[in-house]
């Protein structure tokens, strides 16, 4: 029996939880496949993808720092990937390489489905204006919040990002500002798409951002609160979540694209959480 091959590619890659996630998805759905982690040289992404494809690979997940290169490698892209200008999922077929970006869909599904927080008519704040923010912006707009504010330490980047996406959702109030300019404003959902948690820091935000029953969401994850979530707790955010659910849900979106079946994520997410917490 031929086993379909998949992989996640990045640099670094040894920390990736994707092989374990997809192995469980395959077991759960009865799919015959293998999934491995591939380390690509920083200057050798294209060659590594082509080698895997020529060897019979069916698809790949792409992580840092190669999502922009993956976008350039595709023959066709999903609209959400085109809008993001970045790809985290490749599917190889007879008509070439198809690219998708499942990050935003994973974020929305985690918030709306797992956390039971509808985004429609909510005041949403997205922190950051880099690749992580850009990758989730179109699905966030499609969720039809009342307003979506992009805040960044460099306000010019936030304004440029808002201008690039404003036409995608003319009925959503989309604005941009600096962190300092957030003073006096209140939000129902605050999403951290900055890399501050990687440096064990939190974005420097003015106090009083969180409405009653607000959600603070960090796209990073770890054991216990990230620095952003700890700061949000102190500032009154009553619901807090890290990005582990987003990781699992974006993987499920990739699996659905490749295999045509959506796996159940609840058990996988619970198992990963136990591992993170040392259980």
From Swiss-Prot:
NADP(+) binds at residues 128-132, 219, 243. One of its GO terms (biological process) is aromatic amino acid family biosynthetic process. It is an enzyme of class 1 (oxidoreductase). Disulfide bonds: none annotated. Shikimate binds at residues 16-18, 63, 88, 103, 221. The active site is at 67 (proton acceptor). It comes from the Bacteria. Keywords: Amino-acid biosynthesis, Aromatic amino acid biosynthesis, NADP, Oxidoreductase. NCBIfam families: aroE, PRK00258.1-2. Belongs to the shikimate dehydrogenase family. This is Shikimate dehydrogenase (NADP(+)).
């Amino acid at each position: 029996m031929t086993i379909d091959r998949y992989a996640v590619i990045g640099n670094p890659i040894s920390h990736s939880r994707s092989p374990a996630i997809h192995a469980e998805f395959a077991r759960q759905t009865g799919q015959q496949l293998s999934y491995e982690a591939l380390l690509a040289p920083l200057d050798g992404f294209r060659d590594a993808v082509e080698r895997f494809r020529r060897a019979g690979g069916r698809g790949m997940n792409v992580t840092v720092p190669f999502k922009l290169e993956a976008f350039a490698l595709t023959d066709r892209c999903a609209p959400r990937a085109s809008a993001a200008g970045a790809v985290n999922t490749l599917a190889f077929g007879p008509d070439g390489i198809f690219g998708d970006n499942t990050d935003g869909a994973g974020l929305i599904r985690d918030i709306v489905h797992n956390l039971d927080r509808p985004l429609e008519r909510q005041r949403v704040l997205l922190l950051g204006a880099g690749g992580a923010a850009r990758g989730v912006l179109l699905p966030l707009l499609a969720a039809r919040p009342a307003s979506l504010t992009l805040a960044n330490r460099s306000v010019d980047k936030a304004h440029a990002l808002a201008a690039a996406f404003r036409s995608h959702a003319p009925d959503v109030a989309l604005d941009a500002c600096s962190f300092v300019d957030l003073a006096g404003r209140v939000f129902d959902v605050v999403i951290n798409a900055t890399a501050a948690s990687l440096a064990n820091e939190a974005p420097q935000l003015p106090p009083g951002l969180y409405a009653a029953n607000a959600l603070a969401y960090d796209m990073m994850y770890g054991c216990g609160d990230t620095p952003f979530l700890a700061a949000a707790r102190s500032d009154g955010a009553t619901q807090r979540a890290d990005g582990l659910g987003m990781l699992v849900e974006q993987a499920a979106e990739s699996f659905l694209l490749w295999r045509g079946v959506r796996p159940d994520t609840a058990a996988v997410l619970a198992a990963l959480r136990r591992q993170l917490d040392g259980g």
